[in-house]
């Protein structure tokens, strides 16, 4: 079985296992029991990374060199190319059950003037991109999640079940928790069968608009109150104590920018 979990715009230093002030015990446990990278490259932005991850190709080869709108240039068409085979398509042909839960954002979804007004999904319900580019038509047996890249966490725009728009969400809905619950439910169902499964779990968090639950806001509201310079100095001192940097004052060059 294969489970791929993707966070959205998560910083390298935002995880506890890499020294963050934010508590991430479950991810830290995964890191401790698995492999942590200390040197790697990626494609920098959200949707190009998704295109590369799902196809094994450079983002331009996959058709998404920048974002999900058509720049009318090869490699910049804003939609996952039909010449780029997804891992879901390959595994499905190999006998795997395939599921996607979460954010797609590799089909052309043009910017609109009223974009900020329709972050909440209830503004309209229609096809958010050509259906042939939806996850269920690119190798996934099913998909619960969003097509667009930016959504309201409490009332997400472009939320779909397969090809069908989800017209309303219950009171208290929070997409991060909803995606987790859906993934857990599906994994439990897969466990009843001997057929191998591939799940791609792609969260919308922590991408803007940075919507958090009240209890999480309360927990961290003072964590960075002292400002980024104080946090930077504290991290640097900790790195010296751990022997990552030599314990000397002039090891780093002068900063380019000052407060």
Task: Locate the predicted segments by residue.
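Formylglycine-dependent sulfatase
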Residues: 1-259
